[in-house]
Amino acid sequence: MVARSKGYRSKTRKLLEKKVREKGAIPKLSLLMHDYSQGEYVVVKINPSIHKGMPHRRYHGKVGLVVGKRGKAYEVKVNIGDKERVLIVRPEHLIPFNGIQKR
């Protein structure tokens, strides 16, 4: 028997799936051009068609705080359990958070 591969995108068959009408489309320019400022809340929403600057699947759907900018990417602080992680994510995988964030 051959050992099962455990790659970076393993177990993402349904998680990184696009709807039929979204396939082949590039993200909205308004989302790509959006300039996030420090202290702004964002949602990590992975775009599976763009591999560059993609975070791990563990962080998909998490709400984080923009800490800074590194090149074209943003540093986003996300809480996983009782630990804080700082992710380096490109804007293709971020959307603005419009809800209420409780701390």
Curated annotation (Swiss-Prot):
<dbReference type="InterPro" id="IPR022856">
    <property type="entry name" value="Ribosomal_eL21_arc"/>
</dbReference>
<dbReference type="Pfam" id="PF01157">
    <property type="entry name" value="Ribosomal_L21e"/>
</dbReference>
<dbReference type="GO" id="GO:1990904">
    <property type="term" value="C:ribonucleoprotein complex"/>
</dbReference>
<keyword id="KW-0687">Ribonucleoprotein</keyword>
<dbReference type="InterPro" id="IPR001147">
    <property type="entry name" value="Ribosomal_eL21"/>
</dbReference>
<dbReference type="GO" id="GO:0003735">
    <property type="term" value="F:structural constituent of ribosome"/>
</dbReference>
<dbReference type="InterPro" id="IPR018259">
    <property type="entry name" value="Ribosomal_eL21_CS"/>
</dbReference>
<dbReference type="GO" id="GO:0006412">
    <property type="term" value="P:translation"/>
</dbReference>
<dbReference type="GO" id="GO:0005840">
    <property type="term" value="C:ribosome"/>
</dbReference>
<comment type="similarity">
    <text>Belongs to the eukaryotic ribosomal protein eL21 family.</text>
</comment>
<keyword id="KW-0689">Ribosomal protein</keyword>
<protein>
    <recommendedName>
        <fullName>Large ribosomal subunit protein eL21</fullName>
    </recommendedName>
</protein>
<dbReference type="InterPro" id="IPR008991">
    <property type="entry name" value="Translation_prot_SH3-like_sf"/>
</dbReference>
<dbReference type="InterPro" id="IPR036948">
    <property type="entry name" value="Ribosomal_eL21_sf"/>
</dbReference>
